[in-house]
Amino acid sequence: LGVVPSSNSEKLVDDLTPFAKALGDKLGMKVEVFTASSYIGVIEGIGSGSVDFGLVPPFSAVLSNKQSNTKNLLVGRSTSGKPGYFAEVFVRKDSDIKSIADLKGKKIAFVDPSSASGYIYAGAMLKDAGIDLEKDIQYQFSGGHDKSLQLLLNKDVDAVASYENVIRKYTKEFPTLKEDVKVIAKSELIPGVTVVASNNLDEETQKKVKQALLEIQNDKETIQILTNLFSITGFEEPNNDAYKSIEKISEKMNIDLNKVK
C-alpha cells in the first residue's frame, strides 16, 4: 500500500500500520505500508509494480493513470460528505495580507510539485490573480503540510498552500493553530484521495482490495485512522470525469502530465 509523504514519513507509516493490518486480515494476506521521499517516488513505485496499490492525492492518481495505465478503484469521501476537498491559502492572523493579490512580493511555502492542494490548485489561484510564480513571489517546497505550517508559524514564509482540514489535522502538533492563522483563498472542489491499482496487479486482487475497503469503511475504529490522516470517512465509486479538472489546472500551470518525473 503506497502513500505519499504528505507529512512526517515515519509517523505516517506507523499510523497507517493498524489500518494495513485490518485490510490484510480482510484480504487474507499481509499488507505493508510504503512511502518515499517524494510524491513522485510513490507514483513510480505503483507504475513499476513494486507498489501494488496506492491511497494517493488526486494529482498523483492522474499522473499514474497517464504514465502507467493504473486504474482508479475508489475515491475517498471527505468529512464534509463530498467526494473531494478544497485547497486553501493560509497566512498568519496578524498579517496584513487579505487576498491572493496581496501575495505579490511575498514568500510562500508549497508542499510538493505533485501536491494538488499544496501546489497545483493554489498556484493556479495565484496565476488567476495575475501573479507570476517565477517573478512575483519567492517560493519553496517544504516536503509536507506540517512542515509548511511550521515555516508559517516561524515567520519564515508569509503564506502556505494546504487543504481545508489541515488545522484540525495538526491541532496536536500546533495547539494554537486555529488562533494563529487565517484563510485568504479557497479553490474549486478537488477530487478526493484516490485508491489506484497498479497495472501489474491482477484483476481478481483489484476486486478483492476494492471490496475489502468498502467493507472496512463500516468499521468505525479502522476508518477513523483514515479520517485522522486524510480527512476521509469512507469510499465511493470514482467519477473519472471529475479528474478532468486536474488536467485543465495542470495545463494552466504548464505541467505536462506525461513528462512529470
Model-based region annotation:
Residues S6-S9, S78-S80, R92-I97, V111-G118:
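Short coil/turn segments
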Residues E44-D102:
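Acidic, polar ligand-binding/catalytic clefts
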Residues D15, F19, S38, V42, ...:
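Stable alpha-helical elements in mature extracytoplasmic
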Residues G2, S7-P18, G24, I190, ...:
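An extracytoplasmic/periplasmic, membrane-proximal ligand-sensing/linker region
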Residues L1-S60:
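Extracytoplasmic small-molecule ligand-binding "clamshell" domains
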Residues I40-G54, Q67-S68, A101, H145-N165:
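Short helices/loops that flank or line small-molecule/ion binding pockets
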Residues S95, K106-E204:
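Pocket-lining segment of extracytoplasmic ligand-binding domains
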Residues D25-T35, S50, K127-S142, K178-D180, ...:
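A local structural motif
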